[in-house]
Amino acid sequence: MSAKKPMALVILDGYGHRETQADNAITNANTPVLDGLMANQPNTLISASGMDVGLPDGQMGNSEVGHTNIGAGRVVYQDLTRITKAISDGEFQQNETLVNAIDKAVKAGKAVHIMGLMSPGGVHSHEDHIYAAVEMAAARGAEKIYLHCFLDGRDTPPRSAENSLKNFQELFAKLGKGRIASLVGRYYAMDRDNNWERVQKAYDLMTEAKAEFTFATAVEGLEAAYAREENDEFVQATEIKAEGEESAAIVDGDAVIFMNYRADRARQITRTFVPSFDGFTRNVFPAIDFVMLTQYAADIPLLCAFAPASLENTYGEWLSKEGKTQLRISETEKYAHVTFFFNGGIEDEFEGEERQLVASPKVATYDLQPEMSAPELTEKLVAAIKSGKYDAIVCNFPNCDMVGHTGVYDATVKAVESLDECIGKVVEAIKEVDGQLLITADHGNAEMMIDPETGGVHTAHTNLPVPLIYVGSKAIEFKEGGKLSDLAPTMLALTDTAIPAEMSGEVLFK
């Protein structure tokens, strides 16, 4: 069998691009190899943060998200951005599970109940999503829309719910129908440690309107809780019902939509609506259509609006199906990233996939050994390139990120310089076997060592772009405006391999 000419992807973890020279461990390092590549080889900048990698706008990238996007060949949206995007492009409003539950209740003259963490925190839920759900129910003809508000105070300031409640009161006034039906702190409604006596308070509040307190408006109920020295998180079960209004308890035939997207604190309260539940004795158990926004657990037999997105035909899986061989190689610190995360959350190797792990050095902090295990990793990588065994190789060098996180500037400069030497050897090996190489990063870090806002040490990732450099015999010209999810289709195109339909990323050369 003839020797294979590998397509290698080298990810310099934490190697971002920043024009400013000040406090930039990358531009201030002595890097003749990388400088030469930038001067003489096709190169461009690609995005590694925010919506381009499925994160909220402006949010810095991270290694897990970065490698998932690279391996998937498509933008992988986190639940928050996935739902936000679905709302903005109309997919949410057309969601079959939500539409059916609402329409069934409307047809029967029943209520649509919407429950969830009423918060702009964006950790477990987002109030913008709840707002959209209320508007959707109204648009589909629901007359009775009842909002059961779980109050935050953990991912938001301890007493910050008033603004959210006022916004919803205004929305209902504008719609001319629906109302806030109940308030309770997340301490009760979102317990995750089997404190069922807490969860029961929230369940009884929603199914029986059983409450310690009743007030005519949500803001009055909240003010009373504050007067009792209860912060948002700990607000006791409070029914919101003005004189003459009918009860907003959940009854047979109603639809209930739970708008939290994060599973861990949504599971317990959701399980109370499952027939087989035995955590406490339920006084009433209404026959309803209950919709989870996302899947909170595979064993909860309730409707789900947004099923987990499974990543079919990632780069690794596709190469395997095409009968190709591949190697994943890194140090301990980033080994999971080039394997588990790169494979879309799959632990096992695909057929034809091999893995090599180089132990990261045993030092207290990596500024003490900025080269980490790069020399040994390079030796193994060069041997793999020359072995003729692999069609594709994915390697991560952790230095810029791991040393960058220490905040020690001089050590981070040394880390960059040690990598430059390593890249020189990798390029040489690729040229020797007539292979191809892409050098990039999953996110930035080392290019900003001092926070320009505070003047303090900057140890976090950045939201800056990352370089992409091509080494190989093809005369290519890169397009502008790429992102991490474009790398897999680009590598497949460079090796004249078919690109699976699931990969919505673009080929980055003209």
UniProtKB/Swiss-Prot annotation:
One Pfam family it belongs to: Metalloenzyme
Reactions the enzyme catalyzes: (2R)-2-phosphoglycerate = (2R)-3-phosphoglycerate
Domain of life according to the entry: Bacteria
EC number(s) recorded for this UniProt protein: 5.4.2.12
UniProtKB keywords: Glycolysis, Isomerase, Manganese, Metal-binding
Binding annotation for Mn(2+) 2: D13, S63, D442, H443
Catalytic residues (UniProt): S63 (phosphoserine intermediate)
GO CC, alphabetical: cytosol
Cofactor(s) listed in the protein's UniProt record: Mn(2+)
UniProt-listed Gene3D superfamilies: Alkaline Phosphatase, subunit A (3.40.720.10), BPG-independent phosphoglycerate mutase, domain B (3.40.1450.10)
Cofactor note: Binds 2 manganese ions per subunit.
Entry's Gene Ontology BP terms: glucose catabolic process; glycolytic process
Listed InterPro entries: Alkaline_phosphatase_core_sf, BPG-indep_PGM_N, Metalloenzyme, PGAM_B_sf, Pgm_bpd_ind
Pathway as given in its UniProt record: Carbohydrate degradation; glycolysis; pyruvate from D-glyceraldehyde 3-phosphate: step 3/5
Enzyme class of the recorded protein, top EC level: isomerase
Binding site for Mn(2+) 1: D401, H405, H461
Gene Ontology molecular function terms on file: manganese ion binding; phosphoglycerate mutase activity
Binding of substrate, residues: H124, R154, D155, R186, R192, R262, A263, D264, R265, K334
Statement: the UniProt record of this protein carries the keyword Iron-sulfur: no
Function of the protein: Catalyzes the interconversion of 2-phosphoglycerate and 3-phosphoglycerate.
Family per record: Belongs to the BPG-independent phosphoglycerate mutase family.
Subunit structure of this chain's protein: Monomer.
HAMAP family: GpmI
The name this protein goes by in its record: 2,3-bisphosphoglycerate-independent phosphoglycerate mutase
Species: Aliivibrio fischeri (strain MJ11)
Organism taxonomic ancestry: Bacteria, Pseudomonadati, Pseudomonadota, Gammaproteobacteria, Vibrionales
GN (gene name): gpmI
